[in-house]
A protein has these predicted regions:
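Conserved donor-binding/catalytic core segment of Leloir-type glycosyltransferases
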Residues: 22, 52-71, 76-80, 90-91
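Conserved acidic donor-binding loop of glycosyltransferase catalytic domains
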Residues: 135-137, 158, 165-166, 172
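Donor nucleotide-sugar binding/catalytic pocket of nucleotide-sugar-dependent glycosyltransferases
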Residues: 3-51
Length: 180
């Protein structure tokens, strides 16, 4: 963490000498003091992948991403546990500090299936099979103004309905394609 802070300070010290910017969110303009320097807003890059269309599985909710309390994995599992329908299934793919929490939840509730780290091509197939994709990250922390979750772009490209919180860094143009 100490080295990360040093690196961050070093990067910020170089910002005044930057002549143009590619930004993830509109809020970065102020944070980086862009001023009148040229800038381009580019939320992310998506490399289209040709996936054979998958048959939808009934009542399958999918989360792919970092397993961390800050990104809402515990909230997702708690909310899923409140669903009183044995036909619902929650698939979780990823790795992180809350891996053990997820594994324990899967042991307690057989409807929760933890896949671990999954190859990207298989993740795309799972996203097409799922009934609903979910990003449980909340927008109350400051960093969410300056980030755009790559999973949002992946989820939208899959064509599967996506539910998530309205994050500050999410452009208004995306809202009609998401359940917020």
């Amino acid at each position: 963490r100490f080295l990360g802070n040093l690196e961050t300070k070093r990067i910020y010290s170089l910002v005044p000498s930057v002549d143009s910017f590619v930004l993830l969110t509109k809020y970065m303009r102020e944070k980086l003091n862009v001023g009148l320097r040229p800038s381009l807003l580019l939320e992310g890059i998506y490399n289209p992948v040709c996936i054979v269309p998958q048959k939808k599985r009934k009542k399958t909710i999918l989360y792919t991403g970092k397993l961390d309390i800050r990104f809402g994995i515990r909230d997702l599992i708690k909310a899923f546990n409140d669903i009183d329908d044995s036909e619902f299934v929650l698939w979780i793919c990823g790795f992180g500090l809350d891996r053990i929490f997820v594994e324990e939840a899967a042991k307690k509730d057989k409807r929760i299936i933890y896949w671990g780290v999954v190859e990207q091509k298989h993740v795309f197939e799972m996203q097409q099979q799922a009934t609903l994709l979910v990003n449980p990250r909340k927008g109350h922390e400051e960093y969410t103004k300056y980030s755009f979750p790559s999973k949002t772009m992946e989820y939208m490209a899959s064509g599967t309905p996506t539910i998530m919180y309205k994050l500050p860094g999410l452009p208004i143009e995306y809202e009609e394609y998401l359940v917020l």
